[in-house]
Each structure stands twice: as C-alpha cells, then as structure tokens.
Regions:
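Helix N-cap at the beta1-alpha1 junction of Rossmann-like dinucleotide-binding domains, i.e.
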Residues: 35-39
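N-terminal Rossmann-fold NAD(P) dinucleotide-binding loop
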Residues: 13-14
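Rossmann-fold NAD(P)-binding glycine/threonine-rich loop
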Residues: 107-137
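Conserved Rossmann-fold cofactor-binding substructure of NAD(P)-dependent oxidoreductases
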Residues: 62-74
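Glycine-rich Rossmann-fold phosphate-binding loop(s) that bind the pyrophosphate
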Residues: 9-10
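Rossmann-fold cofactor-recognition segment
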Residues: 50-64
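C-terminal catalytic/substrate-binding lobe primarily of soluble NAD(P)-dependent oxidoreductases
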Residues: 159-417
Length: 417
C-alpha cells in the first residue's frame, strides 16, 4: 500500500481521513500529523470506530520543519496531503523536498499576517518549482473543488470545446441552511479574511481590484435557483490567468444578506482584525476570539440541509463562431453527510484531493515538478472524482443565457457529461 500523510486536523482533514478509510482501504496506508495530539487521536479513533481502519497519528507543528522532516522519513511517506492552514504551505513543501515525497494542498500560501495580497498570487510557491523539478517530485497546488476541480473543468473545455477561451466565470452558490446564526464552512479566520479582502479579477490582460461586496451578479443556477453572487478574490483566477492570458476571469460566490450584514457589523466594531490587543493579561487577536465563539465548521454537518452548485461558465470561439459552455456539479449536504458525515464543502474538497493523490502515485499526474491542476490531463481525474462520489455535468449555453442582463439564467438544457 502507498504511504500517505495528512497534515492538519480540521474539518477538511477529518473528511479526507474518513473518505480514505471508507473508499481507499486497500490503496493507502494513512498517517495523520496534527499540531494537537488530542485532536489527531479524536480523528483516528473516529475512523477506527466507523470503518475499522487504523490511522497512525503524530504530533508536530507543521511550521516546525526540523521535526516534520524526520517524522516524514520515519513514516516513509510517499505523498503529503497538506490540509493545515495556508501559512504552513512553504514549510511543508520544503519538508517534502527534504524527505523526498510528493505534495498536494487545497489553497494558496499566505502568511498569517498577509492581507490584501496584490495579484498575481502563488509567487512564493513558484520559487520552489525548480527544486521540485530537480528532485523529480510532484507538487499539485490548490486541488480542492474551487480551486481545483474548476481548474480541470477549464482544461477540459479548452481540450474538447474551444479554439479560444475569452471569458471564464466561476460560480459558487450554497443554498443550504443549518442550525446556526453565523458560521463558516471551514476555518473561520481563513474564510472571513477571504470575504473581507479586496476582490481581484482579470480583464483585458490586466489585473483589477475592487472593494469587498462591490461587484455582484444575479444568477439562476442548476439545483439551487436564483441568487445574488459577489466577486471575491480566489486562487483559481490567479493560476488560470497564466493559461488563459487573454481571458476575462472572475470568481463569484453567494453570500446571504444575513451573513454579509453580520460580517460587516463585526468588521466595523473591530472583531474582524488580526492585530493583537491587550485584554487584561492576555494578548489576543480579535478574530481569534470570534473564531473561538463560532461553531466548529464540522458541527454544521448534521443539521445542514440543501444543495451547493459550483459552476464554470466559459465563453469563446469554436470553428470561428461564438461558443459558450457550462461545467458544473450540484451536491447535497444530506447526501455528503450520509456518505462520510461531512457537509458539502468538506466533502467536495476531500474527494479531489484524494483523487489527485491516487493519480500522482499511479503515475497519471506524476508531473515531476510543481503544477496547477489545469496543467494536467483532466479526463482521468474527472472520471476518478465520479468514482469517489462526485458527479458533474456539462452543457452548451445559448447567447441569451450568458447575456449580461439583470438575471443570468444558466439552468436550461442540462446535458450529462
């Protein structure tokens, strides 16, 4: 069996461990490394209880490369799935180089102090590309759903449907409801920072930025209906800009009025801040206090009801004529919970990262260098995520459907991929 290591112990790491235990028992020998051993023990005990699979657990701060390298060597890790916070990425990547194992993650690196990082992103990771190439090791960056699967949708579209792609809009709409007034689907500090930062998008070969919640569109989407989506800075815009330099590229996400108004109120009173303040004898960042008071993201799963649609809408040219396509997936919170006890966000990040790990170790995605998902062959990967539990579809769109009216309706004429 292939030896892989999960680094991290949050919502996504838990879902990934469960998915590996349920669907890849005879494929992987899994270990888990977490900053807090008690959390690691809890995940491993959960996996053993539910699936009868033993996952070895270890304690190490992912930022402590001096301890992480010998630990990976003792485990004889062949691949690391880094699901810790984004500030750990560079140190874990360097640890993989020193211990000679492949690497995957699900987001871009950002230091804990970073805020409003100017585009383009990924410059820190790119500096390690030569080292991965020389070592003939593979690092696949940001292989979740969005970013990740959506990047592969774009590669699939270019391969099969377009001579030239001129516009790429990535959409994420969660119409789910749960028992909590204000909660995030993954690490609150990371999720809230993303929404409070300026948005960045690509147009006419140039980078543009705009204040948060200042750009919006209303879409009617498969499975979730009509929603107002906001432009938010997101990883896939920055990597896809290299593959499609002429295209207008932007990411849009649904944020409910209640969530947005609450977030903006918390920001105005200073609770969405990473600058530490003194409270009695304690020196603490307000965001850490808020995160401690918010529900744990994994706790949303049992009460979550509804669906999530993630889609990529592409416009361009095919054989000299205008052409538009949509690639998308609709997932149910209830179905994801029934499968591995996770909500959609956790489930649809675990599935692609496991698929990528399999394909690297099988050789199909063993690029021997540092790459983004859109640089790899999408066909086997998109088939593999279906095998692991995620379906997707593709459909042509008419000119009327993608026109910039008050409502962009992309629901009609669905065709299975």
């Amino acid at each position: 069996m292939k030896k892989i290591v999960i680094v991290g112990s949050g919502t996504i790491a838990t879902a990934t461990a469960r998915l590996l235990a349920k669907k890849c028992t005879h494929y992987f020998d899994v270990s888990l490394i977490a900053r807090h051993l008690a959390t690691a023990h809890q995940i491993c005990a959960d996996v053993l209880r539910q699936y009868g699979v033993v996952v070895a657990c270890y304690q190490c701060d992912a930022l402590d490369k001096s301890r992480l390298v010998p630990m990976l060597c003792r485990i004889k890790a062949e691949l690391v799935i880094n699901l810790a916070t984004p500030d750990t990425h560079l140190e874990v990547m360097k640890a993989c180089l020193e211990s000679r194992c492949h690497y995957v993650d699900t987001a871009a690196f950002e230091a804990a102090s970073d805020f409003n990082v100017p585009p383009p992103w990924y410059s820190a990771e790119t500096r390690l590309k030569k080292a991965f190439s020389q070592a003939k090791l593979t690092a696949v960056l940001s292989i979740g759903f969005d970013p990740g699967i959506v990047n592969c949708f774009c590669a699939k579209a270019k391969q099969d449907e377009f001579d030239d792609i001129l516009e790429i809009d990535m959409l994420c709409a969660n119409n789910g409801t749960h028992d909590y007034f204000f909660a995030t689907n993954f690490n609150p500090s990371v999720n809230l920072k993303e929404l409070c930062e300026v948005t960045s998008y690509r147009e006419a070969g140039q980078w543009h930025t705009a204040p948060p919640f200042s750009r919006s569109r209303r879409y009617a989407m498969p499975g979730v209906g009509e929603h107002l989506l906001y432009s938010v800075g997101h990883e896939e815009v920055h990597s896809l800009a290299k593959k499609f330099p002429k295209a207008r590229i932007e990411f849009w996400v649904r944020v409910s009025d209640q969530f947005r108004q609450t977030l903006q109120t918390l920001e105005r009173i200073g609770l969405i801040s990473w600058d530490k303040v003194n409270v009695g004898n304690v020196h603490v960042a307000p965001i850490d206090v808020l995160a401690a008071l918010m529900p744990a993201p994994a706790s949303l799963a049992p009460s979550y009801k509804g669906q999530v649609c993630v889609a990529v809408v592409l416009k361009g040219r095919k054989q000299g004529a205008a052409h538009s396509m949509m690639y998308y997936s609709v997932c149910s919170h209830e179905a994801c919970f029934e499968d591995i006890g996770a909500h959609v966000t956790a489930y649809t990040t675990a599935v692609p990262v496991v698929a990528a790990a399999q394909m690297i170790l099988e050789g199909d995605w063993n690029a021997g260098t540092l790459v983004h998902p859109e640089e790899l062959n999408p066909d086997r990967f998109l088939a593999r995520i279906c095998e692991l539990g995620m379906s997707w579809q593709a459909s042509s769109l008419s000119a009327a459907q993608v026109s910039k009216g008050d409502l962009i309706n992309i629901c009609a004429d669905d065709t299975p991929a």
